[in-house]
């Protein structure tokens, strides 16, 4: 396997598509520094799967996309394709064997999306990595050696150097398999841990479910016994409540009569009491009015007495307050005179301080004015200085700009001249490319049209197949709906049929004796002389089922036997086994029966003779005639009454609704109960359901067959459609690729044409620009001279302003010192004046307070004297009216006592009547309470009966009334049975929550546990197998590495003297490193030196040693190709010659691609590619075959 071709588009500096074709032997890539030669190496590494942007000399992977230049915009995609020629000796993956060429492609879009392709088919990065495993080719293999990596080989750690020999030994694919096995083993360990956790959990659940299942079985037995006791107790309690209810109704009538009599007497006495109470209330009102009058007089007397006492006390207190106020007033007037003298002294002191302070303040204002003038001058000088300095900076900046502009203008004129010369050559090249691209675009356009036609045909066929598949899916959906509907219908009917058959088979609802006899007889009933129940052997017209059921009644569950003796035998059986009761009908002889009745159907409402509407087997015809020979079916009750009243023949009349009129006058009607109800209907329903089930099953099978047919058709159609979609996708990809090529060809052509036009315009612009530059250069020289003169003048003015600013600073410091001294003196005088003013203000405030107090005391003395005179007058008036009110109070109190005695007598009479009324009313209340208690008890009984029935219905899903007949003849529960029920309830409650599904869950969980246990064993076995596989891989890897190491060491020892012209070198295995594997150390002894570690050699010696190691590896495991990037750079002329000899020798086995600057290395190349950068930032490719060009072109190639 060798490289045939390398296609680069939009990768790094290769904006346009560049194609490198590599033949056998040696291919050289040359060019000046920075032209993009190493980008070729990066492109090969990148397309082979390199994922590190750092290894590609970038910060991020998007850096590999062409990022634009001065004249070219950035591209949106980078694409590199590497084509290999494959021969029979190459060991590739099975899917790539048989190909003569393999093309690996990688694309990266600026939005971050990427694609990997092998032979134009999308694949994974892993597929590309596996393609090169064990071949020595790869991003980290020894087939690609850059200049930096040469030094890295000799300076890296022994453990890292080991990777080269592992690649040569083919160990990398084993390590990849080992890592895959380890990952698989980790996943298996995780699965085993998960399965173990699940099985452990299942073991716990199994133990719990086992206990729950046993508990559930015990629970069912307890509940069955509790149900029987519960029903027995409930039925007897219902009978007791019903008896109590009847007794209460009798008592209710007796108490009602007595209550009515007592109520009449209560009403009469109540009227008398009401009249007497009205009279007493009037007397009470008069008594209260008189009492209120007495109370008013008494209160007035007490108030006057108290008022006189308070007046005297207030008079004394007022006199005392007036005397005290007069004393205080005299003292305040004396203090006021003293305070006026102190205020006059403080005012004199304050006047002296104010005169001195004003003189100091005037001096301070003069100093402040001086300081303000100096500060204003400083500000003006500083502003002018700043302006001059800013102008000086601006002048200097302009001067520097003009001087720089002169230098730039000179350089630009030189660049313009070189550019004009280059444009002429580029225009000629572009015109030739334009014609070539025109031809390419025509060829691609034809291929695109052909592919579009094929894609359209595939799309049309795919549309037809999709339509057919849509129709098939619609039919399948409709059929699926019908299948589901029929399945549900069939399930419902089967369930109903099974239920009815189970009821019929188990004789559910029939008497216990009937069930016992029929169950005992089983399927051999006929052999035992038992024909079955009456309901089982007859078939009735559906219209008259209800009428015949009503006519037969309980006889429907009579057992038909062959003889009377058989009937007696069965009765004995029931008695002997305590299996309840049963009725048995022997089949009579036909000649012993009377002739059947012939009804008159001409009468209105007479519908049918029951005997004619019933069929049975011939042997049982006499029995049916016996049962129904005299039964006539009529329309309704009115028809039956008309038959009887008209004197019709004696017979049993039955209406279609089930009312029965018997010859003896008995009339039967209402809702039927018991086992016979609906027996004939159930029997007919069973037959109809069986027929319906058969019909639905037949239809279901037909639909199901069609379902499978449509499913197969749909699967086939989906397969065809999938194939078409795959073909269409392939053609679409092909079309997209071709359209991309067409678009690219168009873009290339447009770009070339646009470039030609741009270059022509640019050539004209260059001439104009050259003339403009000359004029601009002359103007810049004048500006420089003017700027220099301006700068000198401004520098002189700045010096003068700085001197003036310093003088003003000293003057300001002096003025500021004087001002500070004056401010201190003024502040001291101000402080003394403030203290004196505060004392004066305090005296003024005290005098004002004192004057206010004097005014208030003078008012108090005047008002107090007036108050004393008023109080003395009021006390005299109060003493005169007090004796008159005392006499009025005495007379009113005597009248009140007489009125109270009369009121007491009347109240006693009313109380006696009230006692009689309460006694009679109490009796009425007792009667009403008794009636209420009886009514309440009746309601309680009704509620208890309802609750009892609801409880039985809820607990056992049966109606208590239907169970009454089973228990009412039995004795009440014995005390020990009640105790047993309590014990059963206690056991059930003690059992706690019961999982009734535990048995089924236990079985299902056991099954799952067994399955997971088997899975666990399989996982454990798988882990052991993986461990063995890893051990085998390790053993094989160690063996192959050791063999390769020995051979490479031998070759290295032979090559080293050839490269150095003598000396010796070898490889040594070091102790095992952190990974448990030994490293590889290099020791070398160049000619004339001691044996030493390779790290101690010079740069050139290190490079040559590394080359020797690589060539040693090549001798035992040559790779399909080898790419050496400036490996010869550190070598001198002699070493380069020996290096080239080795390359020529090994190029017979492998393909060599050399990137070099060395002319001697170029000479050994069969083909040279020159990489140039005629336009900044864009690499361009030229090539020469050395054997065709000859030595005469050597200088030209080197220049490229």
From Swiss-Prot:
GO terms for molecular function: ATP binding; ATP hydrolysis activity; DNA binding. Residues 171-219, 252-342, 679-706, 735-762, 1002-1039 form a coiled coil. It holds the Pfam family SMC_N. Residues 528-644 form the SMC hinge domain. InterPro entries: P-loop_NTPase, RecF/RecN/SMC_N, SMC, SMC_hinge, SMC_hinge_sf, SMC_prok. Its main location: cytoplasm. GO terms for biological process: chromosome condensation; chromosome segregation; DNA replication; sister chromatid cohesion. The keyword Transmembrane does not apply. Residues 772-795 have a biased composition (Basic and acidic residues). One of its GO terms (cellular component) is chromosome. SUPFAM superfamilies: P-loop containing nucleoside triphosphate hydrolases (SSF52540), Smc hinge domain (SSF75553). Keywords: ATP-binding, Chromosome partition, Coiled coil, Cytoplasm, DNA-binding, Nucleotide-binding. It is found in: Cytoplasm. Residues 763-795 are annotated as: Disordered. ATP binds at residues 32-39. Disruption phenotype: Conditionally essential, the primary defect in an in-frame deletion mutant is in chromosome segregation and organization. Cells are temperature-sensitive; they grow slower than wild-type at 25 and very poorly at 32 degrees Celsius. Increased sensitivity to DNA gyrase inhibitor novobiocin, cells are longer, and contain 2 fully replicated chromosomes that are not completely segregated. ParA, PadC and bactofilin BacP are less organized than in wild-type. All these phenotypes are stronger at 32 degrees Celsius. Synthetically lethal with padC or triple bacNOP deletions. Homodimer. Probably forms the Structural Maintenance of Chromosome (SMC) condensin-like complex with ScpA and ScpB. Belongs to the SMC family. Contains large globular domains required for ATP hydrolysis at each terminus and a third globular domain forming a flexible hinge near the middle of the molecule. These domains are separated by coiled-coil structures. A conditionally essential component of the chromosome segregation machinery. Required for chromosome condensation and partitioning. Important for positioning of ParB-parS complexes (ori of replication) and of the ter replication site, as well as for segration of the ParB-parS complex and thus chromosome segregation. May act via the formation of a condensin-like complex containing Smc, ScpA and ScpB that pulls DNA away from mid-cell into both cell halves. This is Chromosome partition protein Smc. It comes from Myxococcus xanthus (strain DK1622).
């Amino acid at each position: 396997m060798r490289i045939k071709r390398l296609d680069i588009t939009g990768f790094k500096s290769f904006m346009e598509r560049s194609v490198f074709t590599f033949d056998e032997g040696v291919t050289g890539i040359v060019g000046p520094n920075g032209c993009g030669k190493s980008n070729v190496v990066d492109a090969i590494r990148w397309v082979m799967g390199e994922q590190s942007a750092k290894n590609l000399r970038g910060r991020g992977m998007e850096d590999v996309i062409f990022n634009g230049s001065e004249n070219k915009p950035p591209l949106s995609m980078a694409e590199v394709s590497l084509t290999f020629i494959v021969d029979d000796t190459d060991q590739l993956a099975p899917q790539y064997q048989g190909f003569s060429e393999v093309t690996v492609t990688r694309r990266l879009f600026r939005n971050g999306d990427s694609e990997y392709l092998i032979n134009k088919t999308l694949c994974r990065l892993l597929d590309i990595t596996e393609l090169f495993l064990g071949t020595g080719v790869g991003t980290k293999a020894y087939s690609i050696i850059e200049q930096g990596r040469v030094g890295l080989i000799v300076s890296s750690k022994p453990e890292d150097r080991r990777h080269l020999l592992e690649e040569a030994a083919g160990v990398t694919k084993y390590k990849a398999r080992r890592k895959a096995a380890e990952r698989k083993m980790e996943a298996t360990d995780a699965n085993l841990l998960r399965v173990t956790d699940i099985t452990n959990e299942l073991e716990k659940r199994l133990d719990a479910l086992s206990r729950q299942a046993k508990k559930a079985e015990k629970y069912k037995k307890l509940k069955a016994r509790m149900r029987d006791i519960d029903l027995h107790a409930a039925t007897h309690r219902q009978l007791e409540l019903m008896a109590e209810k009847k007794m209460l109704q009798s008592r209710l009538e007796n108490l009602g009569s007595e209550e009515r009599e007592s109520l009449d007497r209560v009403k009469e006495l109540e009227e008398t009491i009401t009249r007497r109470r009205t009279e007493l209330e009037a007397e009470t009102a008069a008594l209260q009015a008189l009492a209120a009058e007495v109370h008013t007089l008494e209160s007035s007397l007490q108030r006057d007495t108290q008022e006189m006492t308070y007046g005297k006390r207030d008079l004394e207190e007022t006199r005392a307050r007036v005397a005290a106020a007069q004393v205080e007033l005299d003292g305040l007037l004396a203090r006021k005179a003293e305070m006026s003298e102190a205020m006059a002294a403080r005012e004199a002191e304050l006047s002296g301080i104010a005169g001195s302070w004003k003189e100091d303040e005037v001096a301070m204002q003069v100093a402040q004015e001086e300081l303000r003038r100096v500060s204003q001058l400083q500000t003006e000088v500083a502003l002018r200085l700043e302006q001059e300095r800013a102008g000086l900076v601006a002048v200097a900046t302009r001067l520097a700009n003009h001087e720089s502009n002169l230098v730039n203008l000179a350089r630009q004129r030189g660049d313009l001249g070189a550019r004009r010369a280059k444009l002429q050559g580029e225009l000629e090249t572009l015109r030739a490319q334009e014609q070539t691209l025109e031809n390419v675009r025509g060829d691609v356009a034809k291929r695109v049209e052909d592919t579009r036609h094929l894609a359209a045909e595939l799309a049309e066929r795919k549309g037809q197949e999709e339509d057919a598949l849509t129709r098939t899916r619609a039919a399948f959906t409709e059929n699926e709906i019908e299948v589901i509907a029929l399945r549900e219908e069939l399930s419902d009917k089967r369930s109903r049929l099974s239920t009815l058959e189970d009821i019929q088979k188990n004789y559910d609802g029939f008497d216990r004796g009937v069930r016992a006899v029929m169950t005992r007889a089983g399927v051999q009933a006929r052999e035992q002389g038992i024909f079955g129940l009456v309901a089982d052997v007859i078939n009735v017209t559906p219209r008259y089922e209800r009428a015949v059921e009503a006519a037969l009644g309980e006889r429907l569950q009579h057992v038909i036997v062959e003889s009377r003796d058989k009937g007696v035998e069965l009765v004995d059986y029931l008695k002997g086994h305590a299996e309840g009761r049963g009725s048995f009908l022997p089949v009579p002889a036909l000649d012993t029966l009377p002739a059947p009745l012939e009804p008159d159907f001409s009468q209105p409402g007479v519908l049918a003779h029951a005997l004619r509407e019933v069929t049975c087997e011939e042997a049982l015809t006499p029995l049916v005639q016996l049962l129904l020979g005299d039964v006539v079916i009529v329309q309704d009750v009115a028809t039956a009454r008309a038959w009887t009243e008209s004197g019709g023949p004696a017979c049993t009349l039955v209406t279609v609704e089930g009312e029965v009129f018997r010859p003896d006058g008995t009339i039967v009607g209402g809702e039927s109960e018991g086992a016979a109800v609906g027996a004939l209907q159930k029997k007919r329903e069973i037959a109809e359901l069986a027929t319906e089930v058969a019909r639905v099953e037949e239809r279901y099978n037909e639909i199901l067959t069609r379902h499978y047919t449509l499913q197969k058709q749909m699967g086939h159609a989906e397969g065809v459609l999938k194939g078409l979609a795959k073909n269409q996708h392939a053609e679409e990809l092909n079309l997209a690729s071709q359209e991309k090529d067409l678009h690219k060809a168009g873009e290339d052509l447009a770009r070339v044409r646009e470039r030609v036009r741009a270059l022509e315009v640019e050539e004209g612009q260059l001439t104009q620009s050259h003339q403009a530059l000359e004029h601009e250069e002359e103007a810049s020289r004048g500006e420089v001279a003017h700027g220099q003169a301006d700068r000198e003048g401004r520098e002189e003015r700045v010096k003068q302003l700085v001197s003036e600013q310093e003088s003003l600073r000293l003057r300001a410091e002096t003025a500021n010192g004087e001002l500070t001294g004056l401010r201190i003196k003024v502040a001291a005088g101000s402080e003394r004046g403030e203290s004196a003013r505060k004392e004066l203000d305090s005296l003024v405030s005290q005098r004002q307070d004192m004057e206010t107090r004097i005014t208030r005391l003078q008012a108090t003395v005047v008002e107090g004297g007036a108050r004393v005179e008023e109080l003395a007058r009021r006390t005299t008036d109060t003493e005169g009216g007090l004796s008159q009110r005392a006499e009025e109070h005495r007379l009113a109190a005597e009248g009140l006592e007489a009125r109270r005695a009369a009121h007491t007598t009347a109240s006693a009479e009313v109380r006696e009547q009230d006692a009689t009324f309460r006694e009679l009313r109490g009796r009425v209340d007792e009667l009403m309470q008794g009636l209420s208690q009886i009514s309440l008890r009746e309601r309680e009984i009704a509620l208890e009966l309802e609750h009892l029935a609801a409880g039985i219905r809820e607990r056992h899903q049966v109606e208590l009334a239907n169970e009454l007949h089973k228990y009412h003849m039995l004795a009440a529960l014995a005390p020990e049975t009640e105790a047993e029920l309590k014990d059963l309830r206690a056991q059930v409650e003690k059992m706690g929550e019961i999982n009734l599904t535990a048995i089924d869950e236990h079985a299902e969980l056991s099954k799952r546990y067994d399955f997971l246990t088997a899975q666990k064993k399989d996982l454990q076995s798988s882990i052991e197998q993986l461990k063995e596989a890893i051990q085998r891989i390790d053993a094989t890897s160690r063996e192959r590495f050791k063999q390769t190491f020995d051979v490479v060491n031998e070759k290295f020892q032979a090559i080293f003297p050839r490269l150095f012209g003598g000396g010796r070198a070898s490889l040594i295995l070091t102790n095992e490193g952190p990974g448990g594997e030994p490293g590889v150390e290099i020791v070398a002894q160049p000619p004339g030196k001691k044996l030493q570690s390779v790290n101690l050699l010079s740069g050139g010696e290190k490079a040559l040693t590394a080359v020797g190691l690589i060539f040693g590896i090549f001798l035992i495991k040559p790779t399909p190709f080898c790419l050496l990037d400036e490996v010869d750079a550190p070598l001198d002329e002699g070493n380069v010659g020996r290096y080239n000899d080795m390359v020529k020798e090994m190029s017979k086995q492998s393909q060599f691609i050399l990137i070099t600057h060395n002319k001697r290395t170029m000479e050994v190349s069969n083909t040279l590619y020159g990489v140039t950068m005629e336009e900044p930032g864009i690499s361009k490719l030229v090539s020469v075959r050395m054997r065709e060009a000859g030595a005469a072109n050597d200088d030209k190639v080197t220049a490229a």
